[in-house]
């Protein structure tokens, strides 16, 4: 009985829908993609709007260092001038991507959905779905080029994702002090100068007799030097 129900559902899906594939491209131009780059980016697609059964969803990754990624078996509604809408989300662990959300509209031009066209639009926060056709002045979304592929790349003004951002920089990270501490050689030089300055005072505190002998030795050498010059 369960097998019969599954067969009927599958047959119903075939009658109502046709399936297609969609291919896009992930690019970090002018940088070439590496294995590490493509392993840290993901793409997801969700069917929205007009669907009969459970909305279609799928996740995919970049196939190779060419940057191509593919969604397979996207169901299209059959009928003349019938649309099927999807939304694509792109996420990366390293980069701020654009467009983050992509809206796809497939339009079928025959009863079998064999003749169809597809358009892509850049999406924004708060505009995750296509505007209702009954709205007189719907929001206009920017149409994206798909020649030869729909391209997803990084945001030029802020390419890298900042997981931690220091709001107020302290005195130790800016100015002269920050410049010194940013270089280990400058830091070592400053520490050496400080030690040379405070060393006599430390010795005098810890061992007054040794400090007195050191001062007498310095004075003796100065007197000998003065006598030699005369």
Swiss-Prot record:
Keywords recorded for this protein, A-Z: Endoplasmic reticulum, Glycoprotein, Membrane, Protein transport, Signal, Transmembrane, Transmembrane helix, Transport
Record-annotated membrane-spanning stretches: 188-208
UniProt main location, coarse: endoplasmic reticulum
Cellular component terms (Gene Ontology): endoplasmic reticulum membrane
UniProt topological domain (Cytoplasmic) ranges: 209-230
InterPro entries reported in the protein's UniProt record: Sop4
Signal peptide: 1-17
Function text: Involved in the export of PMA1, possibly through the monitoring or assisting of PMA1 folding and acquisition of competence to enter vesicles.
Protein name: Protein SOP4
Organism lineage: Eukaryota, Fungi, Dikarya, Ascomycota, Saccharomycotina
Underlying gene: SOP4
């Amino acid at each position: 009985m369960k097998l019969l129900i599954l067969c009927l559902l599958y047959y119903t899906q075939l009658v109502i829908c046709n399936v297609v594939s969609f291919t896009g491209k992930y690019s970090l131009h002018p940088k070439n993609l590496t294995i590490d780059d493509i392993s840290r980016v993901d793409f997801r697609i969700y069917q929205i709007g007009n669907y009969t059964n459970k909305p279609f969803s799928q996740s995919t990754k970049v196939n190779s260092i060419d940057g191509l990624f593919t969604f397979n078996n996207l169901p299209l509604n059959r009928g003349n001038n019938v649309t099927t809408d999807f939304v694509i989300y792109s996420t990366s662990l390293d980069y701020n991507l654009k467009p983050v959300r992509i809206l796809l509209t497939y339009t079928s031009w025959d009863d079998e959905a064999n003749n169809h066209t597809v358009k892509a639009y850049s999406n924004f926060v708060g505009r995750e779905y296509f505007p209702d056709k009954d709205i007189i002045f719907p929001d206009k979304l920017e149409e994206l080029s798909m020649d030869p592929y729909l391209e997803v790349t990084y945001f030029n003004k802020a390419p890298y994702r900042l997981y931690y951002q220091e709001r107020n920089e302290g005195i130790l990270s800016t100015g002269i002090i920050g410049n010194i501490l940013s270089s280990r050689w400058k830091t070592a030089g400053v520490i050496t100068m400080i030690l040379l300055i405070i060393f006599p005072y430390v010795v005098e505190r810890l061992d007054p007799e040794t400090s007195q002998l050191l001062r007498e030795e310095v004075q003796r050498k100065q007197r000998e030097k003065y006598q030699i010059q005369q």
